[in-house]
């Protein structure tokens, strides 16, 4: 049985009065992580060798996820970088690249794969899980606006620049909710009940409205304190991820 599609998912993109200035404090989150016992594996469950594919956010590349990558490896998981390139292209193209990486990780480990996506990367992860649930052990989103894009005006301006570039390739609806590609239709689809979810958010998010980053379900939504940018290096987020992965084991298929 599938869970409901994201409630209130909006196809348009709207500005949100979020505190962008707070993102300048992201360095404090990184320092807090380094000072936290969770960063060194204290008080969290060990991994079982299952794969976890990390997906970067809008305009980002895999490289800023290396801190999270190393931490997961130290815990005993088998992390993979997404290999999608810069997250500033046609969503369907990015989704196909992500699928290739997930299939590689699935074949190497012989079991479904965890997906951990930051911001727009989490939306790509949810879309893939909805379309190919047999490949996915669980989905973790970190500040991902999967209920509709409500962002700071400067973020929407950057999105429009990407859209203009893609339009030159004769894809007028790309980077909008009106696109009917598999990536967008997958985001609108119901998430299968077989795929456990974790939605990490912060009410001090300076990039997106935190209200579009949650399922409105206390069983899946976890609030942390910090910035949007540094959700990939937030001690509260790391603790929630470790707890979620330990609970979300999927059996190895024959």
Q: What is the predicted function of each stretch?
A:
Residues 9, 19-22, 44-48, 54, ...:
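Generic structural signal for short, flexible, solvent-exposed coil/loop and linker residues
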Residues 29-35, 42-45, 49, 56, ...:
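Residue-level signal for well-ordered alpha-helical segments
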Residues 6, 10-13, 37, 47-50, ...:
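Generic, low-specificity signal for short hydrophobic/alpha-helical stretches with a mild N-terminal bias
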Residues 16-37, 43, 117-133, 145, ...:
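Contiguous hydrophobic segments
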Residues 1-53, 64-70, 75, 108, ...:
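Flexible, membrane-associating and regulatory peripheral segments of lipid-active enzymes
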Residues 130-254:
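Helical cap/lid subdomain of alpha/beta-hydrolase-fold lipid enzymes
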Residues 51-63, 67, 73-188:
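Serine-dependent carboxylesterase/thioesterase catalytic core
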């Amino acid at each position: 049985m599938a869970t409901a599609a994201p409630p209130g998912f909006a196809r348009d993109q709207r500005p949100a009065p979020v505190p962008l200035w707070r993102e300048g404090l992201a360095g404090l989150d990184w320092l807090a992580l380094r000072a936290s016992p969770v960063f060194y594996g204290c008080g969290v469950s060990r991994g079982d060798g299952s794969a976890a594919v990390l997906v970067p956010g809008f305009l980002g590349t895999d490289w800023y996820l290396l801190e999270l990558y190393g931490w997961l490896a130290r815990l005993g998981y088998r992390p993979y970088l997404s290999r999608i390139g810069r997250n500033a292209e046609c969503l369907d193209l990015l989704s196909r690249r992500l699928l290739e990486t997930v299939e590689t990780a699935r074949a190497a480990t012989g079991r479904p794969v965890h997906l951990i996506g930051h911001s727009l990367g989490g939306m790509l992860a949810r879309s893939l899980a909805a379309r190919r649930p047999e490949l996915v052990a669980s989905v973790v989103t970190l500040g991902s606006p999967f209920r509709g894009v409500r962002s700071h005006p400067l973020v929407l301006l950057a999105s429009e620049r990407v859209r203009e570039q893609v339009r030159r390739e004769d894809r007028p609806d790309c980077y909008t909710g009106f696109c009917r590609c598999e990536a967008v239709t997958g985001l609108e689809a119901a998430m299968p009940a077989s795929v456990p979810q974790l939605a990490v958010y912060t009410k001090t998010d300076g990039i997106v409205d935190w209200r579009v980053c949650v399922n409105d379900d206390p069983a899946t939504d976890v609030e942390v304190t910090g910035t949007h940018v540094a959700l990939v290096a937030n001690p509260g987020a790391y603790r929630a991820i470790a707890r979620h992965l330990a609970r979300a084991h999927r059996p190895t298929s024959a």
